[in-house]
Every structure is written in structure tokens, then in C-alpha cells.
Amino acid sequence: MTDVVSTEAPALSPLEALGQAIVANSAGAITAWSVAFGELNLLGPANRIVQALTYLRDHPDYRFHQLVDLTGVDYPERERRFDVVYHLLSLIKNHRVRLKVQTDEDTAVPSVTPVFPVADWFEREAFDMYGIFFDGHPDLRRILTDYGFHGHPLRKDFPMTGYVEVRYDDELKRVVYEPVKITEFRAFDFLSPWEGAKYALPGDEKAEKRAGDA
């Protein structure tokens, strides 16, 4: 007797079915989906991000009415080094999705402030931290760093020390800007992140003496 082998495709999970339906009905504004760590991820072309978010917000089956966050991710080895990531929430349907588009240092992504006004400060932060441009933003300027700040701190190639230090000069009675000067080098080379540094601190010898007398 031969075993009967089923040729039916395995049933999709609710998230997989949602991703499949979103891509199928998006008219090309969203091109791919995947499920990772229990979350639905969507991918689309950057030049159609406004259409994609409008579709997700207004479609009666999805109703993603809240843009929870917008941020960037830097992959310097890629030609289009930046992911722009949009986190959406549907309170009505109890769904969350993450929509990603890719861009480079010179190509602006359309601003989504006409769709979600809350994106105003989110896009300014992504511009400030990553140097991602947003075409059509009403006021695209830095929001976290100081005036005249050089570079974008969350890029992978930005030095950890920065370029300029800001301090208050008591003699001049004003804030001054100076190039960063590394006056001390510390090598933190621990065998385990749970092991503390073995520094000799004042008073340590007393503790060692008491331990020896015990």
C-alpha cells in the first residue's frame, strides 16, 4: 500500500495571509512581505511610499491609522545604504506592520507628512541622525544636534568621539566649540562582559589584608 502524499500548500498563518493580501492589492506600491520574529515586514519602492502608506491607512481591511515611528538603518556596504523604516499600528484590527524602503545619500524619499502629520519630527530626526533627505517636507532641518553640527551621528562611519566638543568657557563667559582632543586612551579588554575591571583603587589593600587575617 502506497502512502498518499498531499500536494496542497501548507495553510498560511494570519500574518502571512495579511502580508500576501496587502501586496496583492497594493498595485505595486508594496512589492514583498516576510514574517520574522512574529512581526510582518513589508518592502516597497521609495518613490511610492506616499501611495503605500495611504493605501495601508485607508483600506477598510487594514486601517493602519497610526504611524508609531519612523527611523533609519545604515548599511554602508550597500549601494543604497539606508533603510527608511515606518512602523504602523491598526487599533481597529489589532495589527502592526513594518514597512521598509531603501535610498542612498543623494536620493530624497518623498515626505509622508501629508498622510501622517506626525511624521514631521520623525523625518527631521532621520535627516539629522542619518542625512536622509525627504522631498516635500515643510521644514527639513536638524532637530537634535546643535547649529552648524558636522556629520550625522547614527551613520556607521561617524566617529564615536565626534568631531567637535561643546563646552562652556568660564573665562569667555560663553559656549565654545573646539576640535575633539583625545587626552587619554583606555583599552577595555575583558574576558567576559560580566567581569569588572581589576583596577587598584585606594583602600583595596585594607580589604586584602583583612581577608588574609581571617
From Swiss-Prot:
Reactions mediated catalytically: a quinone + NADH + 5 H(+)(in) = a quinol + NAD(+) + 4 H(+)(out)
GO molecular function terms attached to this record: NADH dehydrogenase (ubiquinone) activity; NADH:ubiquinone reductase (non-electrogenic) activity; quinone binding
EC assignment: 7.1.1.-
Keywords noted in UniProt: Cell inner membrane, Cell membrane, Membrane, NAD, Quinone, Translocase, Transport, Ubiquinone
Superkingdom of origin: Bacteria
SUPFAM superfamilies named in the record: Nqo5-like (SSF143243)
UniProt keyword S-adenosyl-L-methionine present: no
Annotated membrane topology: Peripheral membrane protein
Record localization: Cell inner membrane
PROSITE patterns membership: COMPLEX1_30K (PS00542)
GO CC terms in record: plasma membrane
HAMAP family named in the record: NDH1_NuoC
Subunit and partners: NDH-1 is composed of 14 different subunits. Subunits NuoB, C, D, E, F, and G constitute the peripheral sector of the complex.
Role played: NDH-1 shuttles electrons from NADH, via FMN and iron-sulfur (Fe-S) centers, to quinones in the respiratory chain. The immediate electron acceptor for the enzyme in this species is believed to be ubiquinone. Couples the redox reaction to proton translocation (for every two electrons transferred, four hydrogen ions are translocated across the cytoplasmic membrane), and thus conserves the redox energy in a proton gradient.
Record-stated family: Belongs to the complex I 30 kDa subunit family.
Name listed for the protein in its UniProt record: NADH-quinone oxidoreductase subunit C
UniProt source species: Caulobacter sp. (strain K31)
